[in-house]
């Protein structure tokens, strides 16, 4: 590798709003504040929910289904 052309690769801490602290390496050069992480994101905690806005799926299926196909 050439000398003097690569950015500094330093250890930083990424702090989540839930209080989780993650130590990692980055070229950013300063600590990061995160909104969500793997400990508090709904997908990873199992609290994710599927929202069907006003029966849109049923409305679509009713409109574009082929009569007599069921």
From Swiss-Prot:
State if Ribonucleoprotein is listed as a keyword: yes
One GO molecular function term of this record is: metal ion binding
Which metal ions or organic cofactors does this protein require, according to UniProt? Zn(2+)
Q: Which family does it belong to?
A: Belongs to the bacterial ribosomal protein bL31 family. Type A subfamily.
* Positions with a binding annotation for Zn(2+): 16, 18, 37, 40
What does the entry list under GO cellular component?
Answer: ribonucleoprotein complex; ribosome
Cofactor mode of binding and number, as noted: Binds 1 zinc ion per subunit.
Quote the PANTHER family the UniProt record gives.
Answer: 50S RIBOSOMAL PROTEIN L31, CHLOROPLASTIC (PTHR33280), LARGE RIBOSOMAL SUBUNIT PROTEIN BL31A (PTHR33280:SF6)
What's its job?
Binds the 23S rRNA.
Return the protein name. Large ribosomal subunit protein bL31
**Known Pfam families for this protein?**
Ribosomal_L31 (PF01197)
Assembly and interaction partners: Part of the 50S ribosomal subunit.
Q: Name one GO biological process term.
A: translation
Supply the PROSITE patterns for this chain.
Answer: RIBOSOMAL_L31
Q: Which InterPro entries match?
A: Ribosomal_bL28/bL31-like_sf, Ribosomal_bL31, Ribosomal_bL31_A, Ribosomal_bL31_sf
Keywords attached to this entry = Metal-binding, Ribonucleoprotein, Ribosomal protein, RNA-binding, rRNA-binding, Zinc
> Where would one find the signal peptide in this protein?
none
